[in-house]
Swiss-Prot record:
SUPFAM superfamilies given in the database record: Ribosomal protein S20 (SSF46992)
Biological role stated in the UniProt entry: Binds directly to 16S ribosomal RNA.
GO molecular function (one): structural constituent of ribosome
Alphabetized UniProt keyword annotations: Ribonucleoprotein, Ribosomal protein, RNA-binding, rRNA-binding
Protein name: Small ribosomal subunit protein bS20
A family per Pfam: Ribosomal_S20p
Family, as annotated: Belongs to the bacterial ribosomal protein bS20 family.
């Protein structure tokens, strides 16, 4: 543990941010997995709605700084391409 008070505070803040980022990334992975499962099952209408949800979550994560803005856009683009190829 750090001895300096500001360093102790930074440790607490970093732990909170790490927990938040981990939670957001887990939600992203789950949303993407559900989209791909519905796509693999052939439920294209469900996949379209799930893609909208994934897009929303990705852009929210980018806005919070959890992932980079370009990474969010790239993932949305690739998932949309997957959906369009499957239809």
């Amino acid at each position: 543990m750090a001895n300096i008070k500001s360093a102790q505070k930074r440790i607490l803040v970093i732990n909170k941010k790490t927990a938040r980022n981990r939670m957001i990334k887990s939600q992203l992975k789950t949303a993407i997995r559900r989209f791909e499962e519905s796509l693999a099952a052939g439920n294209f209408e469900e996949a379209k709605t799930r893609l909208k949800l994934v897009e929303k979550k990705l852009h929210q994560a980018a806005a919070k700084g959890t992932i980079h803005k370009a990474k969010a856009s790239r993932k949305v683009s690739r998932l949309a391409t997957k959906l369009n190829k499957a239809i």
